[in-house]
């Protein structure tokens, strides 16, 4: 029976350890892939699939790429979601006995990329570790390119919702997980995430999530005795997730992770909570249509000059603060920068010269930093003293704190300046890295190399004089070394001591003993100098390993300063004002504007509006008006102004007082989720269920046209009861827009509900939208006028007008009945219920509705399912 060849046996032994990865197997100057890996790679990379004799009866499928061009191919595979294991020759083939030893030196995955050419400068590349048990969830994530590591645990209610919010917020490229077998909810959740999000998800070894093992991984990484010293509490589920994450990184990267030297353990009470719907509807970092940065809040506020600042401003926008003191510290810093245009300009000029210090430190830690990376580091730190000098008179506050955290790193600059050429070679293997004067032995070799060129020129001239051949020249190539070249027409003049080396079409090439002696001296010096340069560079890079924490601390301070500069620049450019943020429950905005819409409108055409909301007599603003009048823009504008204030930004208004807001909820638009089997109405109800279950008195609710996804009477009923529930049970500050003009009657019953409308000017049969929100209620929807503006044919418009008149006459009595009936049966009308005849349960025991209720398992029913069940029961009741 035929067996695999020794080399293929070696391949299979290594491949079996990395079954989930495509293995790039180093053979000389190529990386080769075999069997299934080869078929996958040839298809994905569009390269030729061949075959190789492997010792078996049939040949092994094979494809390969040159090692010097492998990065491009690897990057393409990783971007498609594949893992790639790099298997290198780990001993010199010239001294190997038998098969050259090989081993995997790194596994590259979507979440462990460090190649800056593949990473977005202003966006993190996160890898998530998820541990789900019956007790809750441990959630940790890392950006290996910067060393940032965070962890939390999610317990209690709304675990799945909080997880979805966190995952969608950080947008990881890879997720590893373990779900305890008995935790069915967790398994279903993972499958849902796999379907919805475009990330690489893989189940990881369960034993790496075990608490004792995970704890040891954390202790070893941070060189500590107890995990409590990092901030973990006993039995914190984040321990399981973090330990497994560290194990995964070490097992794939095959090296120490010295740049991961701190961990941020956070809770959900530190920042404003923004769920996935709110972030999408407010278009915080990208637009709903097109998924573009342009048109988002980030587009307006991002004036950052550094890559680190660009990543940080994205985080700030998605994580507004709840601590009033910290908010005001940011606002004071922004005010200082906004009020001093000269300071701001000088700061900008310094910031724009600074490279990505976070990712440079990551490359140093990984041992992948090139000579040019070190030059970029040197150039960056050269501007740090200038930044510190700008704020030398700053005595307190956030700016002073940041400047204290900026280390000028002058010793690092001096080291690189004295050792690395200003324009070094790209490759470590070609020399051209180390400056003269840094190493004595290298200096001697440099002299020999320079003298060697002079020796060659001198020999060439001597041979021309001796032979009389004016066209004679001395050349060099890597195969033959140095040679003397004589054209065919002068061959008869070649001396006898010339030794023929190569014959070409038009010339002959020779060597001489003297030339060979010179070659040995010159090439020996060059080869030795290249080897020493490489050793010296590695030594310098290793010296910088000990300074990574200093570089990272400085990078974080520079990034934060960059974001504050960005806020100040945006405030100055767009005429924003400093908001007042306090602990009250009042929102008072004068002449507020939508930060994005005003930017895209020409000639300052945006109409500003006031907003006043509290939790007492102006708690729910019932807003009516036609489509296109600006209701949605107005409501989003209020939400964005609150959010901007709580990230420490100035706001688009003439004044703004913001009572701290713990969550912003939005029920905006009709976003069908048909791929998940959810209709417009179901999505609407699910989002509303989330709001009523999680909102507090400190929350802001944006409710836009609830109930329009179903029939008129169903929709009106749901909108009516929802408004009542918000007003009575939640007490949340709410902007509630509707086309159901009947809802304006609620202001007569509830003190906290106030009616507002968007002004419209009628011009004969046309309508002009004034976009001004004032007290009162609209009496018409102007739907036909809007249809006319949209360009519907005149015949349709005329016919619609006739139908509308008929319908209005028929429904006026029915609508009056609904209004009177509903007003008499509000949630507060409990006295009516008490006076009704007491009914017995036996009267209904055999009804279909009671049978349906018996079937419901409350322990396994999610809020969304419950709302859907309630909706179905309501329909059955309506049919009785």
From Swiss-Prot:
NCBIfam families: mutS1, PRK05399.1. This protein is involved in the repair of mismatches in DNA. It is possible that it carries out the mismatch recognition step. This protein has a weak ATPase activity. GO terms for molecular function: ATP binding; ATP-dependent DNA damage sensor activity; damaged DNA binding; mismatched DNA binding. Pfam families: MutS_I, MutS_II, MutS_III, MutS_IV, MutS_V. One of its GO terms (cellular component) is cytosol. One of its GO terms (biological process) is mismatch repair. Keywords: ATP-binding, DNA damage, DNA repair, DNA-binding, Nucleotide-binding. The keyword Nucleotide-binding applies. The lineage of its organism: Bacteria, Bacillati, Bacillota, Clostridia, Peptostreptococcales. Belongs to the DNA mismatch repair MutS family. PROSITE patterns: DNA_MISMATCH_REPAIR_2 (PS00486). It comes from the Bacteria. This is DNA mismatch repair protein MutS. InterPro entries: DNA_mismatch_repair_MutS (IPR005748), DNA_mismatch_repair_MutS-lik_N (IPR007695), DNA_mismatch_repair_MutS/MSH (IPR017261), DNA_mismatch_repair_MutS_C (IPR000432), DNA_mismatch_repair_MutS_clamp (IPR007861), DNA_mismatch_repair_MutS_core (IPR007696), DNA_mismatch_repair_MutS_N (IPR016151), DNA_mismatch_repair_MutS_sf (IPR036187). ATP binds at residues 625-632. Coiled coil: none annotated. Gene3D superfamilies: 1.10.1420.10, DNA repair protein MutS, domain I, MutS, connector domain, P-loop containing nucleotide triphosphate hydrolases. SMART domains: MUTSac (SM00534), MUTSd (SM00533).
């Amino acid at each position: 029976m035929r067996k695999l060849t020794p080399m293929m046996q070696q391949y299979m032994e290594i491949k079996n350890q990395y079954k989930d990865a495509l293995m790039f197997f180093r053979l000389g100057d190529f990386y080769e892939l075999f069997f299934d890996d080869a078929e996958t790679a040839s298809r994905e990379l569009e390269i030729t699939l061949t075959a190789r004799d492997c010792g078996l009866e049939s040949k092994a499928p094979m494809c390969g790429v040159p090692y010097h061009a492998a990065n491009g191919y690897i990057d393409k595979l990783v971007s498609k979601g594949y893992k790639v294991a790099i298997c290198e020759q780990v001993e010199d083939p010239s001294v190997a006995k038998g098969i050259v030893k090989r081993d995997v030196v790194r596994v590259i995955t979507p979440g462990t990329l460090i190649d800056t050419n593949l990473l977005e400068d202003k966006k993190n590349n996160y890898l998530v570790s998820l541990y789900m048990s019956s007790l809750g969830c441990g959630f940790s994530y890392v950006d290996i390119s910067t060393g940032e590591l965070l962890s939390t645990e999610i317990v209690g209610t709304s675990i799945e919702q909080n997880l979805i919010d966190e995952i969608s917020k950080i947008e990881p490229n890879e997720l590893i997980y373990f779900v305890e077998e008995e935790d069915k909810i967790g398994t279903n959740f993972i499958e849902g995430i796999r379907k919805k999000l475009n990330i690489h998800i893989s189940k990881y070894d369960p034993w790496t999530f075990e608490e004792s093992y995970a704890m040891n991984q954390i202790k070893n990484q941070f060189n500590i005795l107890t995990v409590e010293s990092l901030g973990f509490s006993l039995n914190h589920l984040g321990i399981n997730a973090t330990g497994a994450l560290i194990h995964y990184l070490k097992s794939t990267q095959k090296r120490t992770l010295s740049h991961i030297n701190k961990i941020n353990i956070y809770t959900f009470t530190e920042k404003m909570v923004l769920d996935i719907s709110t972030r999408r509807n407010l278009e915080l970092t990208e637009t709903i249509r097109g998924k573009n940065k342009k048109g988002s809040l980030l587009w307006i506020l991002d004036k950052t000059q550094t890559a680190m600042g660009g990543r940080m401003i994205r985080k700030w926008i998605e994580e507004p603060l709840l601590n009033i003191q910290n908010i005001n510290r940011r606002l004071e810093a922004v005010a200082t920068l906004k009020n001093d245009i000269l300071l701001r300009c000088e700061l900008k000029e310094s910031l724009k010269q600074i490279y990505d210090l976070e990712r440079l430190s990551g490359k140093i830690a990984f041992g992948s930093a090139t000579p040019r990376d070190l030059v970029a580091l040197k150039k960056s730190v050269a501007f740090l003293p200038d930044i510190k000098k700008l704020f030398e008179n700053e005595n307190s506050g956030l700016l002073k704190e940041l400047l204290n955290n900026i280390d000028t790193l002058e010793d690092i600059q001096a080291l690189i300046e004295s050792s690395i050429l200003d324009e070094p070679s790209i490759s470590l293997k070609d020399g051209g890295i180390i400056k003269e004067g840094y190493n004595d032995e290298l200096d001697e070799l440099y002299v020999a190399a320079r003298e060697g060129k002079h020796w060659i020129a001198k020999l060439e001239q001597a041979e021309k004089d001796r032979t009389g051949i004016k066209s004679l020249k001395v050349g060099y190539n890597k195969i033959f070394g140095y040679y003397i070249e004589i054209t065919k027409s002068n061959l008869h003049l070649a001396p006898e001591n010339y030794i023929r080396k190569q014959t070409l079409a038009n010339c002959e090439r020779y060597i001489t003993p003297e030339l060979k002696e010179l070659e040995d001296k010159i090439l020996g010096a060059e080869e030795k100098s290249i080897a020493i340069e490489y050793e010296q560079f590695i030594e310098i890079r290793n010296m910088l390993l000990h300074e990574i924490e200093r570089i990272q601390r400085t990078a974080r301070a520079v990034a934060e300063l960059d974001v504050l500069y960005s806020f100040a620049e945006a405030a100055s450019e767009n005429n924003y004002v400093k908001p007042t943020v306090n602990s009250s429950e009042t929102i008072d905005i004068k002449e507020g504007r939508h930060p994005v819409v005003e930017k895209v409108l020409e000639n300052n055409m945006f109409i500003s509006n006031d907003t006043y909301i509290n939790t007492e007599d102006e708690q729910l603003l019932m807003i009516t008006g036609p489509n296109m009048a600006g209701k949605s823009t107005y409501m989003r504008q209020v939400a964005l102004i609150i959010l901007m204030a709580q990230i420490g930004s100035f706001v688009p208004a003439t004044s703004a007082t913001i009572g701290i807001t713990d969550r912003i909820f939005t029920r905006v638009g009709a976003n069908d989720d048909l791929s998940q089997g959810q209709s417009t109405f179901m999505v609407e109800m699910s989002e509303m269920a989330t709001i009523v279950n999680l909102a507090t008195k400190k929350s802001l609710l944006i409710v836009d046209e609830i109930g329009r996804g179903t029939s008129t009477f169903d929709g009106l009923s749901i909108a009516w009861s929802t408004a009542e529930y918000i007003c009575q049970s939640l007490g949340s500050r709410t902007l509630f827009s509707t086309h159901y003009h009947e809802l304006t009657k609620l202001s007569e019953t509830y003190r906290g509900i106030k009616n507002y409308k968007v002004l419209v000017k009628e011009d004969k049969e046309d309508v002009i939208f004034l976009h001004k929100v004032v007290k009162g209620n609209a009496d018409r929807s102007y739907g036909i006028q809007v249809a006319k503006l949209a360009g519907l044919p005149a015949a349709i418009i005329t016919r619609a007008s006739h139908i509308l008149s008929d319908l209005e006459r028929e429904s006026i009595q029915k609508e009056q009945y609904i209004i009177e009936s509903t007003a008499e049966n509000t949630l507060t009308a409990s006295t009516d219920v008490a006076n009704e005849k007491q009914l017995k349960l036996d009267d209904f025991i055999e009804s279909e509705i009671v049978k349906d209720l018996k079937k419901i398992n409350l322990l396994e029913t999610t809020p969304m399912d419950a709302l859907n069940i309630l909706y179905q029961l309501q329909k059955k009741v309506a049919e009785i």
